[in-house]
């Protein structure tokens, strides 16, 4: 009797590795592979500072991210090899208060 080997079909899961900036608060860099910054422009890396590992995250099956649009992250990773998440703009509490007072 002859054995038949059936190859396993492996889907390529999309992961990202997220690094925190050592120079800029609330700034994060998403890359495809751990410690691989080869596709990130040198000028960006210089301004970003020493990357500090924040987390590794699977993107497949995920519906959303906390502070970034999932589809934009996936597209940026596949097209340019990185995604830069900048901090949200600061709230102008005085302006909000003055507009609510009228």
Swiss-Prot record:
Coiled-coil segments on the chain, per record? none
The segment(s) forming the YcgL domain are 14-98
Sorted alphabetically, which Gene3D superfamilies does this protein's record hold?
YcgL domain
Any one Pfam family here would be YcgL
PROSITE patterns given for it?
YCGL
Q: Please name the InterPro entries in this protein's record.
A: YcgL-like_sf, YcgL_dom
Protein name in the entry: Protein YcgL
Q: Which species is this UniProt entry from?
A: Salmonella agona (strain SL483)
Lineage runs:
Bacteria, Pseudomonadati, Pseudomonadota, Gammaproteobacteria, Enterobacterales
* Gene this chain is encoded by: ycgL
């Amino acid at each position: 009797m002859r054995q038949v080997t059936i190859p396993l079909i492996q889907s390529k899961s999309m992961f990202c590795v997220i690094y925190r900036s050592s120079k800029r608060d609330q700034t994060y860099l998403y890359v495809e592979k751990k410690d691989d910054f080869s596709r990130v422009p040198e000028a960006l890396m210089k301004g970003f500072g020493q990357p500090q590992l924040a987390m590794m995250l699977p993107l497949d099956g995920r519906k959303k991210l906390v502070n970034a649009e999932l589809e934009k992250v996936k597209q940026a990773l596949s097209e340019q090899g990185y995604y830069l998440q900048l901090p949200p703009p600061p709230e102008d509490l005085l302006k909000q208060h003055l507009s609510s007072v009228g």
